[in-house]
């Protein structure tokens, strides 16, 4: 069961979306919410946007704005948690954003992040790196204003790999509470691999209402996953985060990257 959910905070509409998703997930599991706000140092700002024509004075002004608007940020977070009847803690740090978020993610069962959106500087500036290095599950949410349900109908993207096995195990709290779960085999049939039917049997022993399905091998894995998820009206995809190396990511056809930017459905990733 999920008992602690971490949500990174900043002064953006993306932060409001993360809070909304955290509320939905926390109410589902009666979980504690950890709000984490990290104000980047000038040095970190310069590393994050090295090719932008910003002077130190401009960056100092930006840092000052972040500090002075922090109170409004916390008011919004606390109001959302209180209105939802949730228990919460708040943490504010100053330093390297990515490092602090990885640190606090290890004190939670799940971290809420945004899916990639072209042209934006996300609070987690390298989501794949964040997932691989934090070592704990994340919920990557699309650009929408509300998340009325997360995990009522779930598609599990299955491929016989350590990453997918870990994702299924970590997602058990969601899977056990779902009304419908489909385990979709992605890729060509491999007689030496663990089939989706066996994973379904394993999940059924945990009380999951589940069935197996086979994806169309004619399309890319990401397209197969998204089509099947939308066809069953899923509100969550569970997937292993593939990305040991650039070579591995190329071999997998960029599945993780594609799902991280699908902007249609929340994705539960684990590695």
Enumerate the language-model features and the residues they cover.
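Short, flexible loop segments at boundaries between secondary-structure elements
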Residues: 148, 262-271
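Small/aliphatic-rich secondary-structure junction motif
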Residues: 1-56, 133-136, 150-215, 234
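Hydrophobic alpha-helical segments and helix pairs
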Residues: 85-143
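A short acidic, glycine-rich active-site loop
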Residues: 55-71
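Glycine-rich, Arg-bearing micro-motifs that act as flexible, cationic patches
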Residues: 113-130, 239-262
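Structural alpha-helical scaffold elements that stabilize or flank donor/cofactor-binding regions
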Residues: 101-104, 130, 174, 230, ...
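Structural beta-alpha unit
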Residues: 40, 75-111, 206-237, 243-250, ...
